[in-house]
Structures are given as C-alpha cells and as structure tokens.
Amino acid sequence: MSAQDKLIKAQHLIDMNDIIREGNPTLRAVAKEVEFPLSDDDIILGEKMMQFLKHSQDPVMGEKLGLRAGVGLAAPQIDVSKRIIAVLVPNPEDSEGNPPKEAYSMEEVLYNPKIVSHSVQDAALADGEGCLSVDRVVEGYVVRHARVTVEYYDKHNEKHRIKLKGYNAIVVQHEIDHINGVLFYDRINAKNPFEAKEGMLILE
C-alpha cells in the first residue's frame, strides 16, 4: 500500500506520525507534477491535507491528536512526492479581542503551484521559520521574496494566478520549496544568520 493509499482512507486523519522528518529522501526530491483532470485520489489527498491544518489550529482537535500547529503542508511532508500544497493562514483577532470577519486570509489547496514572478525586494520573518518536518529550532532570517505572483490549479482543474505579499507570500514560498526539495534553513546565511541586506523587509 502506498503512502497516499493509506492517507486517503475515509477513516484516516493525518497526524504527526504521517509527517516525515528531515533526513528522509522524499524531502530532498523534486516532486512530480500532478496530471489533469485531477484523480479522485489527488483531490482527496488535498482535502485531507487541509483537514490536518484545520485540526492543528483547533485547540481541542490539536490536543486530541497531538498535533503541532501549522499554516501550510506540502505533499512530500507526508511522503507523497507530488506537487500539492495546502495553505491555511488565520486572520488575527482585532485589538479588542473580537474574532475577524474573515476567519482566514488564505485557505487553498494548490496543485502544481509555481512562482511566475517576484519582487526584487527580499523579506524574512523576524522570528525565523519553523517546519513540521524539522523537530529543532534553526535560528536566522529565512530570506525570501517580499512579493510573489503564483500560478496554480484548484481541485476543480481551474487555473489561477494570484499576487501575494507579507506573511501569505512567505508561507506559500515555504511550501513551494518543499515540492522542490528545499528546506527553510537552506535559505539562512550560515555565516551570519541574522544578516539583513539593505532594503530587506523584516516582518514582525
């Protein structure tokens, strides 16, 4: 039984046991493009990946399943070497603690996503990045593009082109790196981890 066959079973909920860790060769492989029209198996896998992210961000389900909270998941992280990523970025509460009008600033499963253009300006998260496939803290600025234009297909086989900036751009770049065999710490300057080149945007 392939990893995907196990993951898409109706009763299966993706948990931390399904997520492979650094050292596994799947994380360093360039994943294969999915074919269109999408197979039911690839659609279900995308839905399961999104379900995992929602569970991971839910305090009750997260604790029940022992999940680390995540905002993105790429198919290679669950040992399926395909170009599929899921992104779920929640909007914050307002200054008075009221819930946001829109729960998520980005909620999408992207098939065969690719960056078609990007800004000259770089950006990095002030607190660095983490990864569900990396069980250790790696400090430093993960240098990325401040703005990107991404093309992808959705589960209905429809093509989209979106412009992203800020945190959403960072998350999508992190996940696209996964389908290209790149891990976040590859983008940290090993000699000077917190080097900020002139003009680089540091996102708090």
From Swiss-Prot:
It comes from the Bacteria. It is an enzyme of class 3 (hydrolase). Keywords: Hydrolase, Iron, Metal-binding, Protein biosynthesis. Coiled coil: none annotated. It holds the Pfam family Pep_deformylase. Removes the formyl group from the N-terminal Met of newly synthesized proteins. Requires at least a dipeptide for an efficient rate of reaction. N-terminal L-methionine is a prerequisite for activity but the enzyme has broad specificity at other positions. This is Peptide deformylase. One of its GO terms (biological process) is translation. Belongs to the polypeptide deformylase family. The active site is at E175. Its cofactor is Fe(2+). Its EC number is 3.5.1.88. GO terms for molecular function: metal ion binding; peptide deformylase activity. Binds 1 Fe(2+) ion. It catalyses: N-terminal N-formyl-L-methionyl-[peptide] + H2O = N-terminal L-methionyl-[peptide] + formate. Fe cation binds at C131, H174, H178. Gene3D superfamilies: Peptide deformylase.
